C-alpha cells in the first residue's frame, strides 16, 4: 500500500508497477479510482476497522469526536455525517486503514485464492491497479470490486476506472 507513508510515495508505486508488468505474465489491468473517496468513507466502518488495531477506548473516543467535527462553509458550520476532512494529519492514516480493510485484505484473502495465474494489487491512496494473467480473472475482479465498494459506501469513478489489455503475453 502506497501513499502518505515514508518511502511509499507515488514514484515508489510506479516503480513497483513497472517491475510487476515486466516480471510477470500479466495481460489484463484493472485501473480504478474511487469516486469522492474522502467524502464517502462511512464513520461506522472507520471505527470498526480502528477497533481491530486499537484496544484503548480513549483513543477510539478521540477519533469519534474528530469524525464529528464540522467544517465552516462561509458562516455556516457543516457537521460531517460521513467522510473525512482532507488536509489534516489524521485523515491520510484513517484513509489507509479504510483501504487496507476494504480492498487490500479482501484482495489478499479472497481474490488471489480464485486466481490461477499471476496477479498483483498496487494501492496508492484511493487509486489502485490490479493485474491479472487471464481475462476472466480481471473481468470477475472488476465485477466483484463494484459490489465490494458498495458494501462500504463507496463507488468507482467510472470515467477513471477501466479494464485494459497490457503486456507481452497477450495472445
Sequence positions of predicted segments:
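Conserved polymerase palm-domain catalytic core
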Residues: 1-167, 171
Amino acid at each position: 500500500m502506497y501513499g502518505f507513508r515514508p518511502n511509499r510515495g507515488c514514484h515508489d508505486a510506479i516503480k513497483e508497477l513497472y517491475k510487476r508488468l515486466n516480471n510477470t505474465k500479466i495481460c489484463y489491468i484493472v485501473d480504478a479510482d474511487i469516486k469522492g473517496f474522502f467524502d464517502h468513507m462511512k464513520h461506522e466502518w472507520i471505527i470498526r476497522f480502528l477497533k481491530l488495531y486499537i484496544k484503548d477506548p480513549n483513543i477510539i473516543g478521540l477519533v469519534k469526536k474528530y469524525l464529528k467535527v464540522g467544517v465552516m462553509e462561509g458562516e455556516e458550520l457543516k457537521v460531517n455525517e460521513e467522510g473525512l476532512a482532507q488536509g489534516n494529519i489524521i485523515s491520510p492514516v484513517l484513509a489507509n486503514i479504510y483501504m487496507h480493510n476494504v480492498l487490500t485484505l479482501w484482495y489478499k484473502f479472497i481474490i488471489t485464492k480464485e486466481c490461477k495465474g499471476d496477479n498483483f494489487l498496487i494501492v496508492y491512496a484511493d487509486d489502485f491497479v490490479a493485474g491479472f494473467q487471464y481475462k476472466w480473472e480481471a473481468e470477475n475482479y472488476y465485477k466483484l470490486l463494484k459490489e465490494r465498494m458498495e458494501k462500504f459506501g463507496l463507488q468507482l469513478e467510472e470515467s477513471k476506472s477501466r479494464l485494459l489489455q497490457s503486456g507481452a503475453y497477450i495472445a
